[in-house]
From Swiss-Prot:
Entry keyword annotation includes RNA-binding: yes
Name recorded for this polypeptide: Endonuclease MutS2
Residues of the Smr domain: 704-779
HAMAP family tied to this protein: MutS2
Binding site for ATP: 328-335
Enzyme Commission number, as recorded: 3.1.-.-, 3.6.4.-
Gene symbol of the encoding locus: mutS2
Amino acid sequence: MNNKILEQLEFNKVKELLLPYLKTEQSQEELLELEPMTEAPKIEKSFNEISDMEQIFVEHHSFGIVSLSSISESLKRLELSTDLNIQELLAIKKVLQSSSDMIHFYSDLDNVSFQSLDRLFENLEQFPNLQGSFQAINDGGFLEHFASPELERIRRQLTNSERRVRQILQDMLKEKAELLSENLIASRSGRSVLPVKNTYRNRISGVVHDISSSGSTVYIEPRAVVTLNEEITQLRADERHEEGRILHAFSDLLRPHVATIRNNAWILGHLDFVRAKYLFMSDNKATIPKISNDSTLALINVRHPLLSNPVANDLHFDHDLTAIVITGPNTGGKTIMLKTLGLAQLMGQSGLPVLADKGSKIAVFNNIFADIGDEQSIEQSLSTFSSHMTHIVSILNEADHNSLVLFDELGAGTDPQEGASLAMAILEHLRLSHIKTMATTHYPELKAYGIETNFVENASMEFDAETLSPTYRFMQGVPGRSNAFEIASRLGLAPFIVKQAKQMTDSDSDVNRIIEQLEAQTLETRRRLDHIKEVEQENLKFNRAVKKLYNEFSHERDKELEKIYQEAQEIVDMALNESDTILKKLNDKSQLKPHEIIDAKAQIKKLAPQVDLSKNKVLNKAKKIKAARAPRIGDDIIVTSYGQRGTLTSQLKDGRWEAQVGIIKMTLTQDEFSLVRVQEEQKVKNKQINVVKKADGSGPRARLDLRGKRYEEAMQELDHFIDQALLNNMGQVDIIHGIGTGVIREGVTKYLRRNKHVKHFAYAPQNAGGSGATIVTLG
């Protein structure tokens, strides 16, 4: 498609409307390169992607993608065997992480049926080994200490040396305060110094590094810290060297995967671009138009995208219709209507939503040509008419039946009679060539051409004779008429002059009356359509109100049922507590054996009313929690014993997992790590008690995990667990309750305090869960 039409219709300004929605530099580059397409399947694919994104937002109400810098230049540098700096590696790390997040997001899209985006999601690849290694680069672009043992050693030594220097200088600040111009430790050339008064410079032995501009202060590095500062300088050099070595190693890790990473980055950027199109469509009440296969155009309530308060209009350009001629006076909005059609076509053929209502339809043109406004060439010293005619000649030479042609004020700039004749001849040529054309003109002769010629239709812009102002409403099928007499009368021209003028134009009076009648019919039709639309809007509002009331009612009902359930549970808990008290008294009196107490307690539990809530749909819906999923390669984890973050890289045959933690590979069982994502931690726990054999052979240990449980559910499981532990003669058990809000932990503590079979309990050691777990000794 020719680029001139993009400039004439200011298509770049339309593209700029999408910029605020973009988060990645890749999508910004894609927007910059966006141009109209001439192949219907490609346009359809773009529209399908927007429809898919709409389905995602309906299901999830969001589509999370982080800001990503362009990594194209960094990938080129890798291909040239150049090492990347820390910021470039951080940008690639974010792409790898975003790719992994997007793959997990796609796997959770259960109720979305895709037409196009599924292929993009499925082409994303994960790099668990790379992600694990890249944990050594934090989000601030800093290499963590654990990036290598050598780096950790250097930084630890550097910290110690700096602390010693600081301590020595702080002691000197106190001892030599009267010799100093300021009570602070300064830095010159990367070395710690003291600001000494020039008059006392000989009182402190050391190296002078700087003198203040006034000469009153000398910055001295005391001899006591010279050696330490030299060590620090050397350690910093060693640190830079080690960091360079690590960055080189990271660059080498990336090189074999450049093509795949580049593809991932493009997919993420394109998904961001599709997201931006959807948000633009949603915010501007735009639509995805249908694509006609017979050059039919139908734009319903179409608006100009660059105007702040555009008037919506309907435009129908049927297959058989070749030309629409908009007649009438200037300043009525004819040119705006012309540009609105052109921009709607450009946006649609570029795969963008069109500012129109559902049901709109675009055609696919190989080219769109326009002669709009005064494009007079000063260099060529051409008149307005010559400039227009030169452009029109060029259009007529290039346009074919797959083109759309837009003419503004066709035939203007010359003798009206000759200009009108030229305009009709040009339109006739285009009509016979089956080239769709929309033209504006103020020549009345073209009204007759539109009425008398097949496949040509008149149109006009509505004018309010009462306010003497245009309404900018497009009236298709109604030719424009002059409002000169009405305007002149309202502005105070003598009635006899207006009457005389009318008598001079009697030959046109019949035509004007017909036009007036057509206008009246069009206005009445529009009034009825507006009324129908108002009724439709009222119906929509009513439906929304009914849905809102229903949702509020359902919410209140669920709350009441939950409240009733909690009250019932409290009654049961009270009864069980009373039973514990009774059993305690019995045991104190009769010294019953533990298993006899458990049997008695079971009998008392049977006395509580067993209400079957499993079939209660409301409670099931309220309590439904997404089933736990197994870990998978690429998941981010926290190693429980160390608190370090890592990434799962592979699963061994025996069920254990290999994980990359910094630059260290670890082999872990599934209970030695937890998934990072909070929403994946809230899973329904298996009520089975796992007995773990201790390595020292001190006997069996049982562990109960209460994390993620409701309070009452946790207390019931704890009670049952202690009973079973007593029956199995277990001496010690572990209760994992987590830290969280502390409610479960407090409940566990209270229960253990009042249970006479608990000999001792305390929080676990720090390396075994700390205050998130309690070790219980039974007896």
